[in-house]
Every structure is written in structure tokens, then in C-alpha cells.
A protein has these predicted regions:
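Active-site metal-binding core of divalent-cation-utilizing nuclease and nuclease-like domains
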Residues: 1-4, 12, 16, 20-55
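Well-ordered, non-membrane alpha-helical segments in soluble/globular domains
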Residues: 4-10, 69-76
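Structural motif
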Residues: 26-28, 61-65, 92-95
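Conserved catalytic cores of phosphodiester-cleaving nucleases, focusing on short active-site segments
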Residues: 46-74
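A short acidic, amphipathic alpha-helical/loop segment
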Residues: 72-78, 100-104
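Arginine/glycine-rich "motif VI" loop of SF2 helicases in the C-terminal RecA-like domain
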Residues: 79-86
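Domain-level recognition of nuclease-like catalytic cores that cleave nucleotide substrates
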Residues: 92-118
Length: 118
């Protein structure tokens, strides 16, 4: 799956910036805490989480999708959690997905830092 390749890049990106306690939605890592909404049978699991100086970060790989409603709901949740914990929310957009991601950020006024990855 292509997203797994980008999750590994996100882990490297976070480590290079001094984040530790990395959890990732990959088999070889501890899975980040999942969040559920009432009446929603699918939990929201961040792609990557980490900490630096007790500040929590959430990282999502931002790729194009047909289900933008669910994607935006997840991003709003992670953005809110990051704010509550004094941390940051990063969206890492692979080549070809940056414009799509920027449009969603602008349309829904999401508080996230967009980072381009290759």
C-alpha cells in the first residue's frame, strides 16, 4: 500500500525534527490511540504521533480521497487534540496531493501545518 511508504517518510521527518515516542499506524510500531464518535463504527487512528518537550504532535498523510467528509472530520479532531495538548498538527502531502490538501484546509479553515514530501 502506497500510504505505508509515506507513513515511513513521516516517521523519518518527525525523528529528524527531534520528536520521540513515535507511534505509527504500521505493523512494526505501537499503534497511536484511536478515537471514536458515537454512531460511527470506524475509529479514527492518527497516521503518526510523537512528542517533543511534552508537546504532542499528530501527523497525517494527506492524499486525495472521495470521502472528504470523513477526512475533514478526522483532521478537525486531530487539530483540536493538538491544540488542547499544546502541540501541533501536521499534514504531509506527497507530490500531486498538495493542492487538494490546501483546498480542504482553506475551505474548512483547518488549523494544520502543511508540509510537502516526496
Amino acid at each position: 500500500m502506497e500510504k505505508q511508504k509515506y507513513i515511513k517518510k513521516a516517521i523519518d521527518w518527525a525523528k529528524k525534527r527531534g520528536y520521540s515516542g513515535i507511534k505509527a499506524n504500521l505493523e512494526e510500531f505501537e499503534t497511536p490511540t484511536q478515537f471514536s464518535k458515537p454512531n460511527d463504527d470506524q475509529p479514527y487512528i492518527p497516521d503518526v504521533t510523537g512528542k517533543k518537550r511534552n508537546k504532542k504532535i499528530y501527523i497525517e498523510i494527506a492524499t486525495k480521497t472521495e470521502d472528504t467528509r470523513r477526512r475533514v472530520t478526522k483532521w478537525k479532531l486531530l487539530s483540536t487534540l493538538a491544540s488542547m495538548k499544546g502541540g501541533k498538527f501536521f499534514l504531509l502531502a506527497p507530490h500531486g496531493h498538495k493542492a487538494f490538501t490546501q483546498r480542504l484546509l482553506d475551505k474548512y479553515n483547518l488549523n494544520a501545518q502543511l508540509v510537502y514530501i516526496r
